Amino acid sequence: MDYNYHTHTDRCGHALGEDEQYVKAAIEAGFKVLGFSDHVPFKEVHHPSERMDYAQMEGYLESINSLKAKYADKIEIKVGFELEYFPEFKDYYQELLNRCDYLICGQHNKTLDAYSYDLYADDEDVIIYANQVKAAMESALVSFIAHPDYFMLGRNHWSD
């Protein structure tokens, strides 16, 4: 694989290491493109184990853009965000897209208050999940879908 567009930083609470360490490791591994995609921060809510605090967003963008310039002759670096698609935030997502290279949809939660599909997902939840992912694709804001089978973490079997 020559590229990775789904890289988180320690700001999200579930990754380790400094931003530049990821770049150096990607170069060493022969990557041509490294895309950072930390989880979208929200002013309204902060979940330290899921996403950066809203106040960290500027530092994230500055850090990755600085690395993009520093390593331009060695690797293509992109900066983006991973979002859960909630239509009420469509304008906010567009503002973010105007400031970065791409957005991806990783629909972890049914609602912003962190009802997570990895804990439990019954048949009704799977339909809601599918509709949320479909709406994200139809919005034309996201470039691709991350872990489209995420809802299966909360299920032991496929249903009919």
Labelled PLM ranges:
Residues 1-83, 92, 151-156:
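An N-terminally biased module of ancient metal coordination in phosphate/nucleic-acid-related enzymes
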Residues 11-13, 100, 104-160:
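Domain-core and long-helix interface of multi-subunit machines
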Residues 19, 88-89, 129:
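Amphipathic coiled-coil/heptad-repeat helices and related helical stalk/stem segments
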Residues 23, 56-69, 76, 95, ...:
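Histidine/acidic residue-rich metal-binding segments in metalloenzymes
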Residues 26-35, 95-102, 135-141:
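Short, functional N-terminal and low-complexity linear motifs
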Residues 75-119:
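Hydrophobic alpha-helical segments and helix pairs
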